[in-house]
Amino acid sequence: MVVGNSKGVPVLRSLTRARTPGVVRAPVLTTLAAVLAIAAAVLAPRAFVAAQSHESAAKLFGQFFGFTASQLAAVDAGTSVAVVLPSSVDHEIAVAGAVFVQATAARLVSVLQDVERLESGKGFLRTKRLSNPPRLGDFAGFQWPAGDVEALRDCRPGRCSVKLGQPAFDLLAKIDWSAPDAAEHANAFGRQSSLDYVLAYRKGGNRNLAIYVDSERPQSVAREFEEMSGGVDLWPVVLTPLAKYLRGYPTAARPRQTSDFFYWSLAEFGLRPVFRINHVVVHGTGRASGPLHVVLVKQLYASHYFRTALEVRAVVGDGRPSGKGVYLVMLNMARSDGLTGVLGSLIIKPKATRGSRDGLERALAAVKRMAEARR
């Protein structure tokens, strides 16, 4: 059920409204819709916007992100700021943030698409953009972390520390673990099954996403994603076609000025590295101000922790002349294991939430540095 707030802005059913400064006052996906709608409507007349850009930015981030006056000043000064988005779903974490970037919109969106550079350095072990169409060689650099190889050796449906669907378990059962090259066979299994998974998704979309059976309770990636992103129907005209395309891929019509690609990454999360496969959609609005570019990153698979995830990255202009700077807005949503129960809700989730917020601030700052360094 979707309800409205006092100003008529729809509220996503899985999120609650915050009452304290510094915490977001609107839900995740609807928040971005409101942000971009305000940017498009309020900032449209360039002469008017040029005179009141700071005021518009204050409304943008203050009213809908709940930024305090000091946070607003920090964003305008080029400091990244991130806040926690309240959620009524116990196994969901959502954070949002923004930073002003002194670069053109074109340069910033090019950085956002350069995933191999964007996801590199500390914490990132390997990132690879896939060919179009994807091929087995794209996964040549993939190797299971040593801990995962040991875990896979003993994995069974319903009892495995690596997230796998039934087809993967069927292939895993064919490995001769007594062979001296068993680890390489496990890596070959990972490469081939990853390629098959991406190709199946490209053919059948969400219906071909995994149903994880590594624990006693099967987890449907497609169902979790549909539930988490259920508010995307409320996005404004600019984003609605993108939301439909992401949910209905590959049969849904792809909006104009839209491209997509896939990539995999191996990065450190918590106690162990996580192998992930993502679908990226990039859209240029063709507008002179407001939402200029939107990048959506949909997680298709994660070897640990994450059931599903969605990242939204928006390049928002406030009417300044080209090259004088734009805002980068980022929203990260994820549904994860281990966040429920007494231990999960009281200890693990608060720590993970703080880590997600702090991580987003670092990511915003890193993207800003990359974009400004390329001027």
Question: Which residue stretches match the model-derived regions?
Answer:
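Terminal "cap-and-tail" regions of soluble proteins that handle hydrophobic small molecules
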Residues: Q52-V101, A105-R107, R117-R375
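Short, well-ordered alpha-helical segments enriched in acidic and aromatic residues
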Residues: S110-V111
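Short alpha-helical segments used as structural interaction elements across diverse proteins
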Residues: G22, L43, V295-L296
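Ser/Thr/Pro/Gly-rich low-complexity linker/stalk segments immediately outside membranes or between
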Residues: A47-A51
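N-terminal secretory signal peptides that target proteins for export/translocation
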Residues: M1-R25
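Bacterial N-terminal signal peptides
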Residues: P27-R46
